């Protein structure tokens, strides 16, 4: 393995950790909130009728994240949606370590500014336990996606799981990473 360190991880260890320790008066370095994982998922409800769209979604996710995507299956049958338990209806990728920092860096600094009429991400996307979720309406904001080759424009979800105890700590952590929260 090389001794390569992602830019955001370096920023975290050199700048963000001391700032957070000072801001929240932590007694131990282990109390400082950190990123655990980033989950990128795509729900493809239309996959029930057109299997090709699910494969396209998997390919898009793999292109965006640089890691193999897993197809997700329906947990329950819902008659109104013509959905059976076990049907493949989406895809997801869980990123950890260096890939997580690289993805978050690209997401914050390259993809989000390409969103039409972008005024910042919703500051209410926290779940009460220090995790943040944001929905993206078009996958074409990522430069890796070739506009001419996509089957269908679809959205995706990005969940950032942190070790923070409260939403305030998590918001401070993500803001220091450069997440552009709406005022």
From Swiss-Prot:
Pfam families: Ribosomal_L5 (PF00281), Ribosomal_L5_C (PF00673). The keyword rRNA-binding applies. GO terms for biological process: translation. GO terms for cellular component: ribonucleoprotein complex; ribosome. Keywords: Ribonucleoprotein, Ribosomal protein, RNA-binding, rRNA-binding, tRNA-binding. GO terms for molecular function: rRNA binding; structural constituent of ribosome; tRNA binding. InterPro entries: Ribosomal_uL5, Ribosomal_uL5_bac-type, Ribosomal_uL5_C, Ribosomal_uL5_CS, Ribosomal_uL5_dom_sf, Ribosomal_uL5_N. The keyword tRNA-binding applies. PANTHER family: 60S RIBOSOMAL PROTEIN L11-RELATED (PTHR11994). Part of the 50S ribosomal subunit; part of the 5S rRNA/L5/L18/L25 subcomplex. Contacts the 5S rRNA and the P site tRNA. Forms a bridge to the 30S subunit in the 70S ribosome. Belongs to the universal ribosomal protein uL5 family. This is one of the proteins that bind and probably mediate the attachment of the 5S RNA into the large ribosomal subunit, where it forms part of the central protuberance. In the 70S ribosome it contacts protein S13 of the 30S subunit (bridge B1b), connecting the 2 subunits; this bridge is implicated in subunit movement. Contacts the P site tRNA; the 5S rRNA and some of its associated proteins might help stabilize positioning of ribosome-bound tRNAs. This is Large ribosomal subunit protein uL5. It comes from Treponema denticola (strain ATCC 35405 / DSM 14222 / CIP 103919 / JCM 8153 / KCTC 15104). The gene is rplE.
